[in-house]
Amino acid sequence: MANQVIRCKAAVAWEAGKPLSIEEIEVAPPQAHEVRIKIIATAVCHTDAYTLSGADPEGCFPVILGHEGAGIVESVGEGVTKLKAGDTVIPLYIPQCGECKFCLNPKTNLCQKIRVTQGKGLMPDGTSRFTCKGKPILHFMGTSTFSEYTVVADISVAKIDPSAPLDKVCLLGCGISTGYGAAVNTAKVEPGSTCAVFGLGGVGLAVIMGCKVAGASRIIGIDINKDKFAKAKEFGATECINPQDFSKSIQEVLIEMTDGGVDFSFECIGNVKVMRSALEAAHKGWGVSVVVGVAASGEEISTRPFQLVTGRTWKGTAFGGWKSVESVPKLVSEYMSKKIKVDEFVTGNLSFDQINKAFDLMHSGNSIRTVLKM
C-alpha cells in the first residue's frame, strides 16, 4: 500500500458549527519528508471544539480535525531517515526540525519550519493529502488524527516505546504534556512552594500533577464546578475552592489564604479575566503566573502595570515548553515507569463512529478525556 492511495474512514468537519460526518476519504501516499500513519487511538480536546465552533481565526473548512492521537507508521516518503513502517508514533502539532533558530534556542519549543503551511491546513508543499467526494479536505494542526490514516511531516512525529498502550499515551500529544510542562518547564515550580491552578479540566489536572512532581507543598485548585474537586485532590491538590462561594474577588481570597499570594499560579481556562485574577493572586516580589489556556480570538489581557513593577512575572506556554520530537518519547517513558499519570485522565472509551458523542461528553463538563478507538 506504500505508494497507493488508501481509502478509509474519517470524521470530516464540512462547515463550522455542524456535527462531524463519518465519510470515506482517500489518503494519498506520503511525499518527500512525509509519513503516513495508521491511527489506532485519538482523543477529543477543547481545541478541536474551538475550531469546529467557528471561533478560531485560523479555522478553515472542510477539514479533518484531531491532534491527540497515536498510531503506527504505514509508510514513509522519500528522504525520511529516522522513521520506518511499523514504528509506533505520536503525531505532533508543534514540530521539531532541529535546524531553525527556534529549535536551536533552548528557551523555546516553537519550531517555525512549517508554521505557515500548517496554519493554512496544508502539507509543507502547499497541498493536501486528503480527498472526499472529489474535493480536497484540509489538514488540522499538522496532525488530523480524526482519520484512520493521516499524513504528517516527518518533523512532526515522535517515535515511542512500542509496548506503550496507544489508547492511553495518545493523550501525551496535547493536554497532559501541556499542563505538566507548564509546571515543570515554564513556571519551574520549586519544592515547598504554594501553587494555584485555575480550571480543573484535563490541562488543569496535568498542571496539578506537575506541581506535585516538582515538590510543591500546597496546591490550591480553583473551579466553579465543585464536582471536579475530588478528582483534583486525587491528582495532588491539597485544597479546592469555588470563587462563587466568596463575596470578594478570588485573588483577594487567595492572598488571604496564603499570607500574601501564591508562588506560582496557572490559568487553564482561556478566560482573560481569570488570567488577570491569576496574576494578581501571585505573591508580590517573586510570584509567577503562567497563561496556559487559549483565549478566544481578539481577546486582550489587562492589569495595572504596578502588578508587574512590584515583582510579579506573567508568562505563557505552548505544549508545556517541550521540544516535541525529543521530549514526547521521554514523557511516554515517565508514564511507563509510573512517574506521571495518564490512565486517570481517561474517563471513557468510544468507537470512532461515536465521535460526536465524545464532543457532547466534553461539553457536558463530566468527562476529562474520551478516547476513540479506530
From Swiss-Prot:
Keywords: Acetylation, Cytoplasm, Lipid metabolism, Metal-binding, NAD, Oxidoreductase, Phosphoprotein, Zinc. Its cofactor is Zn(2+). It comes from the Eukaryota. The modification N-acetylalanine is found at residue 2. Binds 2 Zn(2+) ions per subunit. InterPro entries: ADH-like_C (IPR013149), ADH-like_N (IPR013154), ADH_3 (IPR014183), ADH_Zn_CS (IPR002328), GroES-like_sf (IPR011032), NAD(P)-bd_dom_sf (IPR036291). It is found in: Cytoplasm. It holds the Pfam family ADH_zinc_N. Homodimer. This is Alcohol dehydrogenase class-3. It comes from Rattus norvegicus. The gene is Adh5.
